[in-house]
Regions:
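N-terminal beta1-alpha1 ligand-phosphate binding loop
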Residues: 2-23, 183-187
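Short gly/ser/thr-rich secondary-structure transition/capping motifs
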Residues: 21-28, 56-59, 125-130, 162-164
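Short acidic low-complexity segments
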Residues: 26-37
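Structural motif
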Residues: 42-44
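Cysteine-nucleophile active-site neighborhood
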Residues: 49-120
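Pocket-forming structural segment of enzyme catalytic cores
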Residues: 88-165
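C-terminal and late-domain segments of enzyme folds
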Residues: 151-201
């Protein structure tokens, strides 16, 4: 079973529907026993890093996720969920992340040309940096759907692919049993489903 971690943030039901479409048994849950018993974890998320991080901390899910990841349980972060896998974010001040991946999360407006619209919303092609299980069923140049105003920086150790939007925007990351997508695979059509399938296998 795949546990979609419910901490009050994220497009949970759309994600579960996508997993169901590829024949994956997934449950939306905040129950620690179910999370511990799951084969793999997905950490979704939309909104502000600071608020989401606080909600994870309020019910102790942050410590559980860190412990399970360190034990080797596979975990995928999606959008804000991916950002929280890193060490810190500078959204509305400085907030500590889960620290499962090296890097930090910074504002796009501090790095991109003024003529580029923020938030970054739309379809962009993936450019591969290295091999990854996430790439198993997709090819370089496939398009995925982004909605975000912040992005990961200093994540060379885990970087799998990037999108071009004024500069190279990290799109997928993977290091050991921890991986993530800055884009929304559940909104990215067949390509997104293939990425979810690769993670869930």
């Amino acid at each position: 079973m795949i546990a979609i971690i419910d901490y009050g943030v994220g497009n949970l039901y759309s994600l579960r529907s996508s997993l169901k479409a590829i024949g994956v048994d997934a449950e939306i849950t905040s129950d620690k026993e179910k999370i511990m018993g799951a084969d793999k974890l997905i950490l979704p998320g939309v909104g502000a890093f600071k608020d989401a991080r606080a909600k994870l901390s309020d019910n102790g899910l942050d410590k559980l996720i860190i412990a399970l990841a360190k034990e080797g349980k596979p975990i995928m972060g999606i959008c804000l969920g991916m950002q929280m896998l890193f060490e810190r974010s500078y959204e509305y001040g400085v907030s500590e992340g889960l620290g499962l991946l090296k890097g930090e999360v910074i504002a796009m407006q501090n790095r991109l040309s003024p003529e580029l619209k923020i938030p970054h919303i739309g379809w962009n092609a993936l450019n591969f940096v290295k091999d990854s299980k996430l790439n198993k069923y997709i090819k370089e140049g496939d398009f995925v759907y982004f909605v975000h105003s912040y992005f990961a920086s200093g994540c060379e150790e885990s970087l799998v692919s990037f999108a071009e939007y004024g500069e190279q925007i990290p799109a997928t990351v993977e290091y050991g049993n921890v991986c993530g997508c800055q884009f929304h695979p559940e909104k990215s059509g067949e390509v997104g489903l293939k990425i979810l399938k690769a993670f869930c296998e």
